Amino acid sequence: MDKNELVQKAKLAEQAERYDDMAACMKRVTEEGGELSNEERNLLSVAYKNVVGARRSSWRVVSSIEQKTEGAEKKQEMSREYREKIEAELREICNDVLNLLDKFLIANASQPESKVFYLKMKGDYYRYLAEVASGDAKADIVAQSQKAYQDAFDISKTEMQPTHPIRLGLALNFSVFYYEILNCPEKACSLAKAAFDEAIAELDTLSEESYKDSTLIMQLLRDNLTLWTSDTQGDEAEQGEGGEN
């Protein structure tokens, strides 16, 4: 199957909501070694985001059940084994993506926009690994995630408009990383607020094609700020999970 056919099959799989098939097609496109077009890049991202998202969601549900079955040994053991199975799947998916990023995508990125997109993706998939990691391995994974986000952030500040959806999406996810992985609500809030304020100040630079994407991410930044501010003020409510891109 040539590259065009693989891309067409990936689009078909997306419409059928068969994201594992979609990811497999886009993995093969990536492994051909050329730089991906914007469309191909987005297809790859959507495919793996759905594939990993299903496991992240399952992992959270099963972890919660496992915590609630304390005292019921048999049930807890079954929950633990199932959680570990989901974790193994999640790790395999993340390592798949990280391999593609390191071997092909980051090295082949000729434009700052692509470089930021892929470094953000690298930060994201290390963050997903960090969510299920423990012990000594976790510290290294967290450091890898932070470095990728920071590298992307530095490029985005000099090469992209504050209203660019990729720059905004990066700020959103980097702030979620600070809040949920590093437990630094102040840093998370200041990063999200700065990104939101800088974008608001330059709303007139918003291009028509990215208007919808940019304003949606700005809304998520604002929602997270509202949620996190109430959390840090000792809200009685259970800590909310931040929206991400």
Swiss-Prot record:
InterPro entries: 14-3-3, 14-3-3_CS, 14-3-3_dom_sf, 14-3-3_domain. It holds the Pfam family 14-3-3. The keyword Protein biosynthesis does not apply. SMART domains: 14_3_3. One of its GO terms (biological process) is regulation of ERK1 and ERK2 cascade. GO terms for cellular component: cytoplasm. It comes from the Eukaryota. The record marks R56, R127 as: Interaction with phosphoserine on interacting protein. GO terms for molecular function: phosphoserine residue binding; protein sequestering activity. Keywords: Cytoplasm. It is found in: Cytoplasm. Adapter protein implicated in the regulation of a large spectrum of both general and specialized signaling pathways. Binds to a large number of partners, usually by recognition of a phosphoserine or phosphothreonine motif. Binding generally results in the modulation of the activity of the binding partner. Homodimer. Belongs to the 14-3-3 family. PANTHER family: 14-3-3 PROTEIN. This is 14-3-3 protein zeta. It comes from Xenopus tropicalis. The gene is ywhaz.
